[in-house]
Swiss-Prot record:
Optimum temperature is 30 degrees Celsius. Belongs to the AllG family. One of its GO terms (molecular function) is transferase activity. Its EC number is 2.1.3.5. Oxalurate could not be used as a standard substance due to its unavailability, and the enzyme reaction was performed in the reverse direction: the synthesis of oxalurate from oxamate and carbamoyl phosphate. The gene is allG. Component of a carbamoyltransferase involved in the anaerobic nitrogen utilization via the assimilation of allantoin. Catalyzes the conversion of oxalurate (N-carbamoyl-2-oxoglycine) to oxamate and carbamoyl phosphate. InterPro entries: AllG-like, OXTCase_su_AllG_h-dom. The OXTCase is composed of 3 subunits, AllF, AllG and AllH. It catalyses: oxamate + carbamoyl phosphate = N-carbamoyl-2-oxoglycine + phosphate. Keywords: Magnesium, Transferase. It comes from Escherichia coli (strain K12). This is Oxamate carbamoyltransferase subunit AllG. The keyword Transferase applies. Disruption phenotype: The deletion mutant cannot produce oxamate during anaerobic allantoin degradation. However, the levels of oxalate, produced via a glyoxylate shunt, significantly increase.
Length: 419
């Protein structure tokens, strides 16, 4: 089909560029992902793993999900069914989904429905819980469970009804094109895009024939949840990268993800095969009372943003983030994006960055360039406490391990008969 890797890569990148993901709906995970109806099943972030291999925050999120679903009445009972192997685990990526941090998603949890209207493929992600103690970082107290019940019983139906009033939902490309000019890089900073989203949703929510108290609660939640758009950006990037993966050739990375134990990548020319290596631990700034020694190793599907070419690769779009993640100032942000541009093949002119002289965000992460230069993707990330139940303790950056890319390049060469 293709006469060279370069030709294949051009086709993959064009497929990604053509993708037009729209936010269409919010539905229970069980109605979108059939595997969640098969006994006690949870989705998790990262490449495949077992309960025994999980770190503290992911285990804490599993306990929380067991309590939320009513599989257990308390922490001890939840741990017992998890330890006894009664719960089946599936990577989010295996079912067209992504999840931040632990990525733990159960049947009753609401999920965003994002459809690439160009090709018809869909991607799913759970909803952002806001700040404080949250399940994605491993907390599972009654306050966390109460918030999840509210998201299921109030937030989901209101958002679904509001989106139902909008023809073809919300065009996320158009919204992100605005957001990136307003200082978002879509991983650690989403405040502008979340505000744009609120602007689009508010008139539709106000017109709903719903309980006024519920409408007020939803508006209050959206008004203070600066990272609400993150989960939409993740589903957007998943839908676009899955579109690229339809071209089963070339050396373009179509997924990067971490589970607190292993970092995994997928490559366009190698299908759904994972190439893994041990994760690194994020370095950054910590909330008062916490330190680097308490940081959990890297985890989460949110590196799908860097796979697409935003997040850490677009640090120059959000120089304010560099201080939050402990990476310096404006020149440091520029240096990061200039370095990342060396390992991506093209630019995404749909996402032009004013502070980068209106250059487009990076596009087309190439394993060949990573291995040749030794430059690995820089990922912006939240930092979880390594013990279950505590939650987020800071934010920082982390590098993908080079070994994943080396393994993938060797496998690609072998598949092409290059010895």
């Amino acid at each position: 089909m293709f006469t060279s890797v370069a030709q294949a890569n051009a086709a993959v990148i064009e497929q990604i560029r053509r993708a037009r993901p729209h936010w269409l709906d919010v539905q229970p995970a069980s109605s979108l992902i059939s595997e969640l109806n098969e006994g006690k099943t949870l989705l998790h972030a990262g490449p495949p793993m077992r309960w025994q291999e999980m770190t503290g925050p992911m285990k804490g999120a599993c306990v929380g999900a067991c309590l939320f679903e009513g599989w257990a009445k308390d922490e001890a009972q939840a741990l017992a069914i998890l330890e006894q192997g009664e719960v089946n685990f599936i990577p989010c990526h295996h079912v067209n989904a992504v999840g931040p941090m632990g990525g733990i998603t159960s049947a009753s949890m609401p999920m965003l429905v994002v459809e690439n209207v160009t090709d018809g493929n869909r991607a799913y992600c759970n909803l952002n819980e806001g700040i404080g103690k949250v399940m994605r970082f491993g907390a599972y107290g009654e306050d966390v469970l109460t918030r999840h019940r509210w998201m299921r019983d109030v937030l989901m139906p209101v958002l679904s009804a509001a989106l139902g009033r909008m023809e073809r939902g919300i065009d996320l490309t158009a919204m992100m094109a605005q957001g990136i000019t307003m200082g978002d890089e879509f991983h650690q900073r989403n405040i502008a895009s979340s505000a744009l989203l609120m602007r689009a949703l508010a008139p539709q929510i106000a017109r709903l024939d719903h309980d006024k108290q519920h409408i007020a609660e939803v508006m209050d939640f959206l008004s203070v949840t600066d990272q609400f758009f993150l989960n939409l950006a993740m589903a957007y990037c998943k839908a676009a990268m899955d579109a690229g993966a339809m071209i089963r050739a070339g050396s373009i990375v179509t997924a990067m993800t971490r589970n607190g134990n292993m970092f995994g990548i997928r490559v366009s020319g190698l299908g759904e095969r994972w190439f893994t290596a041990p994760v690194n631990t994020p370095q950054g700034l910590f909330f008062t009372g916490f330190s680097q020694e308490q940081a959990n190793p890297d985890m989460g599907d949110s590196a799908i943003t860097e796979t697409f070419g935003i997040g850490g690769a677009a640090m120059i779009a959000a120089p304010g983030v560099t201080r939050f993640v402990g990476a310096g100032g404006m020149e440091a942000a520029r240096a990061v994006s200039e370095e990342m541009a060396e390992i991506y093949l093209e630019r995404n002119m749909q996402l032009q960055i004013p502070s980068w002289d209106f250059q487009g965000a990076c596009l087309g992460l190439d394993i060949r360039r990573v291995v040749e230069t030794g430059i690995t993707p820089l990922i912006n990330t939240g930092i979880a406490h390594k013990e279950a139940g505590i939650g987020q303790i800071g934010a920082g950056t982390v590098r993908a391990p080079l070994a994943c890319f080396e393994q993938a390049l060797e496998a690609l060469a072998e598949s092409m008969g290059i010895g």
